Regions:
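Glycan-recognition and catalytic cores of secretory/periplasmic carbohydrate-active enzymes
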Residues: 1-397
Length: 397
């Protein structure tokens, strides 16, 4: 990758983050009256719904803390990180069991709790960045405590009817992959001592049960022993999810200087990019079938924003770690398609949901699932990766 291209991409990612995406959410997503963050926004940032997804109280707080700790000590970023943590402290925990809600109303009154504890994973990394920024020990302790709730609830969903009966028990890749990135974040922010053990356990689970070299696939849902169920749910692949998991594993390989982990992460990317790339219209398909049979999910051929964010990260990570030209080409391919179709030139930020041909399906900028996370994380990480590539190139010449 030549110097001019690196500098051009840094400008796209850095300026997109600091001058477009972050300002959009700072203008429209801060609830200065009731606290916390509002994410259900129309194309122009106007409010569509005042209910608050708890995932984004944690995710946006994490982003603001991450930027404060690692980009620039802007007081506004720290104050708004505190703003989000304060709302979570006051409204997002169920006092009956210590778990977090999934959805609250504008005032913070609970609406819904889910079986799986992903609100907790995002809150944990937010508390971690807050602790690092402020030096407040209670926040570091709370971050680890919430992480442990996340682990325990996902291993043993107390108080909830199991998702699957014993007729065909199954498990998804979501828990171990989110355990990896959450533990990595907390290792970095608060030096959490149990991080490596959970990362080891989670990577082992994924490579043993979900990673299938004989099929050249990463399976989303498997039996408890890694069996593949030849049914709709068992054959359904989620390329974006698997590619996101791939860069988590690459990142751990980089941290440990472990080439075997890097190799596994790159292999996951190769398989799932090949399966997920739409050869007719371009872009990453949301779901595909392991045997190339029809998929039951009616949104299977839509182009969501976040698989493209994760593939942009993963391909650039693979290029940094291997230097292989195919990953530079892969990154260029997905970057070009995404940046031609998702950005809104008039109002800023990205559309989230496109039809298969890349036309806009719905113009909103945020909802329960889309908010300030995948896109700004992609911009921030790719900015860093490109600076690392720049440095690597300079030392090799």
């Amino acid at each position: 990758m030549d110097l001019k291209k690196i500098e051009r991409l840094i400008k796209i990612y850095r300026d997109g983050l600091l001058n477009d995406v972050l300002p959009f959410w700072l203008r429209h997503g801060i609830d200065r009256e009731k606290g916390g963050f509002l994410t259900c926004l129309n194309r122009d940032g106007s409010l569509l719904d005042t209910d608050k997804p708890v995932w984004f109280q944690g995710r946006f707080s994490w982003l603001l803390g991450e930027l404060y700790n690692n980009v620039e000590k802007r007081p506004e970023w720290l104050e708004l990180c505190k703003h989000g943590v304060r709302f979570m402290e006051q409204h997002c925990f169920d006092p009956s069991d210590g778990r977090m809600w999934f959805h609250v109303n504008r005032e913070g009154l609970p609406l819904r709790k889910r079986r799986y504890a992903f609100s907790e994973s995002f809150a944990a990394i937010a508390y971690g960045e807050y602790a690092k920024a402020t030096g407040e020990s209670w926040a570091a302790e709370k971050a680890q405590h919430i992480f442990e709730i996340f682990i325990n609830q996902n291993l043993d969903p107390k108080g909830f009817t199991p998702k699957y009966t014993n007729t065909r028990p199954a498990k998804g890749i979501g828990f171990p992959m989110i355990a990896i990135i959450t533990a990595q974040e907390l290792r970095g922010s608060i030096g959490m001592q149990i991080s490596n053990a959970w990362i080891d356990r989670s990577i082992e689970t994924i490579l043993r049960d979900h990673y299938k070299p004989e099929l050249k696939a990463v399976i989303e849902t498997v039996g408890l022993g890694g069996e593949i169920y030849d049914h709709f749910d068992g054959r359904m692949l989620n390329p974006g999810h698997a590619i996101e998991c791939a860069w988590f594993i690459m990142q751990e390989g980089q941290y440990r200087n472990n080439n075997e982990l890097i190799k596994h992460g790159c292999q996951m990317l190769d398989w799932m990019f090949e399966r997920g790339w739409d050869k007719q219209f371009g872009g990453i398909l949301y779901n595909v079938d392991l045997k190339d049979l029809p998929v039951q999910e009616y949104w299977h051929d839509m182009k969501f924003w976040w698989p493209h964010n994760e593939t942009i990260i993963a391909s650039l990570y693979a290029y940094l770690l291997t230097g292989e030209e195919k990953y530079e080409k892969m990154h260029q391919q997905v970057h070009d398609w995404a940046y031609q179709h998702f950005p809104d030139a008039k109002f800023g930020e990205w559309y989230g949901y496109l039809h298969r041909d890349g036309s806009v399906s719905v113009p909103l900028k945020g909802n329960t699932w889309k908010g300030p996370f995948h896109l700004p994380r992609q911009q921030l990480i790719c900015w860093r990766l490109l600076e690392a590539i720049q440095k690597k190139n300079a030392t090799s010449t």
